[in-house]
């Protein structure tokens, strides 16, 4: 049985195994608190993420289960990887991942990026997206703060809590506004992996200029700002709008012509502008893919088709439409944790046993 210790971080109780020491707060989001720690087993610095109240509602339980499944499945150099997971006696979930020193948001707010860093960061973002998309996964919330970077400029995409299956009927109001693809605002229904490419394009533009490209105050203002630069959406896109109110709003906007991005980004080299033009396209089906972006001439210094892998298997989304009670998500989550630690579930009494009585048996 693992031994647990408690620490207070920002008024939040961290209850972790003695394997992890030297807790220091790193960041806090809507769904979790992240601390850096020292892994006594490997002597490596790690990030420990506490999921806040994972079993308080079925929605949060499902979200946590989804993120756990994705972290277990996705294994790529440019995607954050899971190194440990455990449930504390208080029934909190803790994900342990590699620790990277900063994120792209912090870099962008501290200093302008030089060309070679912009190229290398964009290359790694697209390399990670190519892999994620090949697994049948859409991130849905790509933004600078979800892109982690270490002192060697290695980049990893993180925070897959909102990720979803590739689905032509995908719904929801998801990504942070500045990086949200127009098809999400226009339809709230039919969108796919192309939304991540749009977000990556917005991030690319921000790296080039040092400030957000589309800083909308709300979703109406956001869409209006997009049309000021990219022009009015084409008829093929307008035809996909499902909401009568949204259609009326779009048709009420003045007709606008697309502005040359070379005028907006006068200091950028032509190849950078050309790639950006291909990423920021209204029609998602005409938007460049992550794989195509990697092959663009702008990224030629880093492009290596033999070292840009795709996923070996598709992610299993069979659970995603399930509407289950909290106790069912608990048992499923515990099963995933036992599987991660290669523990025989029958010997641990998983079947028909309340999760909280077994949580401390997860081996570290």
Swiss-Prot record:
Modification Phosphothreonine, positions: 171
Superkingdom of origin organism: Eukaryota
Modified residues (Phosphotyrosine): 173
Catalytic activities: L-seryl-[protein] + ATP = O-phospho-L-seryl-[protein] + ADP + H(+); L-threonyl-[protein] + ATP = O-phospho-L-threonyl-[protein] + ADP + H(+)
Domain comment (free text): The TXY motif contains the threonine and tyrosine residues whose phosphorylation activates the MAP kinases.
UniProt keywords, alphabetically: Activator, ATP-binding, Cytoplasm, Kinase, Nucleotide-binding, Nucleus, Phosphoprotein, Serine/threonine-protein kinase, Transcription, Transcription regulation, Transferase
Reported cofactor(s): Mg(2+)
Residues the record lists as binding ATP: 26-34, 49
Chain segments annotated as transmembrane: none
Biological process (GO), any one: stress-activated MAPK cascade
Region Disordered, residue ranges: 345-364
Stated family: Belongs to the protein kinase superfamily. Ser/Thr protein kinase family. MAP kinase subfamily. HOG1 sub-subfamily.
Pfam families listed in its UniProt record: Pkinase (PF00069)
Principal cellular location given in the protein's record: cytoplasm
EC number: 2.7.11.24
Sample GO molecular function, one term: protein serine kinase activity
Annotated localization: Cytoplasm; Nucleus
Catalytic site positions: 141 (proton acceptor)
Name of protein: Mitogen-activated protein kinase HOG1
Function as written in the Swiss-Prot or TrEMBL entry: Proline-directed serine/threonine-protein kinase involved in a signal transduction pathway that is activated by changes in the osmolarity of the extracellular environment. Controls osmotic regulation of transcription of target genes.
